[in-house]
Amino acid sequence: MAERIRQTIQSPYLPTAMVLSGWLLAALGYWGAWVWAAPVGLRVPGIDLAEYVKFIAEVRNGQIRLTREVFLFPLVAISLSMSLLAQRSELRLPSVLRWLINLLAIPVALAMLPPAWTPSLLTTPEFIKQTVAMAICIVAAGLSYPLLRRMPLTVSAIFVAILALASLVLPVSAFLKLRIPLDAIYGHPVDFGSGPILLTIGLLLVASSPLLLARRR
């Protein structure tokens, strides 16, 4: 058993399995329920929080101070890490899977679009920051093969790790500030869903994988 564990840890495919699992878990966590309720319609997924918090009275009147865009950070982390890592030969991914992940970075970025958006809405002060973030992610997806795969692995690894950790700490800590107003909205103590837990595990895996690759070089 100990020998099998040692072989698994030393396997060249371990970082690949970690980052693929990380992307999947982070996506499941972000699109999964952060506020749990038995009726499906009362559950709040992570992807809705950037809009949802605008309607919480304590946030609107400044009693709870948070920047709603932090709830979009996981999308930025998933999309940019896909663009930075998908085409890297060190991950030993099949060519088809490389391009699939590379292309998936674009719809992940587009998930930052506000509901019922129009081109003019995207340039308003309320949405310009997420529009810029979305544009950066889409451009990065286009540069993944010709440019980003040639970056030094250590640079990519450090950038992905910092981005993933920031995209974990900032939204989760902001979400925890909402516990009391959420209890008031629902009329009882709310149950948190599995979303934050899955996102945490996923982004920790995404942060660790390229660092492990860089350490093994």
Description of each model-found segment:
Residues 2-217:
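Compact integral membrane and secretory-pathway proteins
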